Each structure stands twice: as C-alpha cells, then as structure tokens.
C-alpha cells in the first residue's frame, strides 16, 4: 500500500508492517489503521495532526500515534513500532466531544458539519428540520441519529463525501459475485433486535404516534413526526460477509448483486476493510479484502 507522508516521501515496504484501509457508511466514512517501524524519520512525520495521502489522493489526518514494543528482536533489542490511526482530513473535529451546544432549525447536513467544525463540503445533501448537539455530546453520534431519522447514510465515493438516502444506494451500478463467494449470516434474531419500532407523542401531549409491530423491539423517540418514525423503520441489516483477495472495487456504499444462476439478490457494502501485511517482520505478505454486506429492511 502506498502511503505518502507530509514531506512527500513514501513509507517503504521495509518500514510498513501492516495497514487496514476502511470505509463505512458513517459520519466519518474513511479511516486508516497502520503499524510501522518506529524509525527516527517516521517518528518525526507521524505525529498527531500530521497528514497522509493514500490511494487516489485521499488525504487523511492522524488522530492517534502510539509507540509500542513488538515481539520481533533485532540486534538484541525489541523492535519499536508506531500504531497510527488516521481519518479523512477535515473530519477530525467531529471525533471530540462538543465544546459548545449547537441548535439548528430548517438546516442541512452541510450546515451541520460546518457548524460542528468539520472542514469538508458534502457533495450530496439532505434538508433537516432540526439538529441539536449539546455541549459534551459526541458530534458523530448526533449526526448518526439525524441520518437515521432521514433514512440516510454518509458515504465516500469518487473523492467526495455525500449524504444519500438508503433507498438510493441500490440504484447505482452493481458488482456481480457468485453466491458461493459470500458467507451468509443466518440469525433470525438479528432483524428483531436491530429494527426497533419507535413511538412518539404528538404535539398535543396525549396522542401516541406510530404503532407497535409484532416481534420488534419498541422504543420511544421524543418529538418525532410520523415521517421520521417511518424512516426509523428503514434500516440496513447485515446479511453476509465476503473475504477475498484484495478487491479495491468493494467500498462502503458499493452495490453487490449475488447471482446463483436462478435468482439475484442486491446487497450494499456496509463496511469494507482492505488489509495489507508486508511480511516485514517475517511471515508471508497478505493483501485481502473483507466486506460486510447488508440488505434493506423496512418499507421502501
């Protein structure tokens, strides 16, 4: 994996031990976990807030840099290493608890990200009736709740972040795989546990909005209208997992069509992790992709 440092140099294969490049359908959709040898040069370039460039010019900012002693021994001494975690540049302010309260009405996700300190612009956007993040709350959690109320997700594609409704995820071009390439998750309790049937109270303070469904958890959502309650029933449920040789086509938001010759199922990638082990400390190199695939549940 090619990792470019802030001075323009590239981490060599002898210094890079392992890396996992990951995309998710979450408010901060791109991250990199990396272990490198703790050389003097790298220690000076891999500190908190330092920049990295990976892939097709994807800019990441380091949010964690930790020195460790590894099991490998060289010249009678344990080899030192650095554990690095980096996220999409501009999103790092969202990882700290809010230093002040934010309350917005008739707003959008673009405005929410900006007010919370993120230095990015969303390609696709959705209007919001209201957004609240109190002082001391985690911005990413508050954004995720708002996304859930709009039946939407955040995704990274073609160098940009966008907010996309869950229904629209399945309208893109799909990648076709044989059913045997997937490990199917057969758990009848996943849907009943994951798809909560939310209820709310009308503005008059007495009428209950929403109706409980059989075999579903029931939860209370304050000040939610009928549209939002309906959106809360529309979720992505993990149905399968795929592990294969490195396949950089698989990223969060990619549509996968599973074909067994007689029928086809459409799934979307919830999380994709691309793993690179260089074998710098011994062992064989590994380049592999693991993806978690989900199906839309709830009314479309």
PLM regions: where:
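Short beta-strand-centered interaction patches in the first periplasmic/extracellular domains
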Residues: 77-82, 122-194
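Short conserved beta-strand and strand-loop elements enriched in small hydrophobics
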Residues: 3, 48-60, 253-261
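Amphipathic, non-transmembrane alpha-helical segments in extracytoplasmic/periplasmic proteins
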Residues: 34, 97-120, 135-158, 253
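Surface-exposed cap/loop segments at beta↔alpha junctions
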Residues: 37-120
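Short, compositionally biased
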Residues: 65-76, 167-170, 268-281
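An acidic/polar, Gly/Ser/Thr-rich interaction patch typically located in mid-to-C-terminal regions
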Residues: 17-45, 186-300
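Polar/acidic, low-complexity leader/linker segments enriched in S/T/G and N/D
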Residues: 1-18
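Ser/Thr/Pro/Gly-biased, low-complexity, turn-/loop-rich segments
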Residues: 94-110, 140, 156, 167-178, ...
């Amino acid at each position: 994996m090619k990792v470019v440092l802030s001075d323009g140099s590239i981490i060599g294969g002898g210094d890079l031990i392992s890396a996992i490049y990951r995309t998710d359908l979450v408010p901060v959709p791109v991250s990199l976990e990396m272990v490198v040898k703790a050389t003097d040069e790298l220690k000076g370039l891999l500190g908190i807030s330092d920049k990295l460039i990976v892939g097709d010019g994807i800019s990441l900012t380091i949010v964690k840099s930790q020195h460790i002693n590894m099991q490998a021994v060289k010249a009678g001494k344990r080899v030192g290493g650095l554990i690095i975690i980096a996220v999409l540049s501009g999103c790092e302010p969202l990882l700290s608890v809010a230093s002040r309260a934010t309350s917005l009405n008739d707003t959008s996700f673009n405005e929410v990200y900006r007010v919370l300190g993120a230095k990015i612009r969303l390609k696709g956007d959705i209007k919001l009736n209201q957004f609240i993040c109190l002082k001391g709350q985690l911005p990413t959690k508050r954004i995720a709740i708002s996304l859930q109320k709009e039946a939407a997700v955040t995704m990274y594609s073609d160098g940009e972040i966008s907010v996309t409704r869950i229904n629209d995820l399945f309208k893109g071009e799909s990648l076709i795989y044989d059913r045997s390439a997937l490990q199917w998750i057969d758990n009848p309790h996943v849907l009943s546990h994951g798809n909560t049937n939310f209820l709310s109270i009308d503005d008059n303070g007495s009428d209950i909005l929403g109706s409980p469904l059989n075999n579903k958890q029931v939860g209370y959502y304050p000040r939610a209208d009928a549209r939002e309650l309906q959106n809360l029933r529309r979720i992505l449920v993990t149905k399968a997992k795929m592990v294969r040789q490195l396949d950089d086509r698989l990223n969060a938001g990619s549509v996968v069509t599973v074909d067994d010759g007689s029928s086809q199922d459409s799934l979307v990638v919830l999380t994709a992790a691309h793993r690179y082990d260089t074998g710098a400390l011994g062992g064989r190199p590994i380049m592999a992709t693991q993806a978690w695939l989900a199906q839309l549940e709830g009314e479309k």
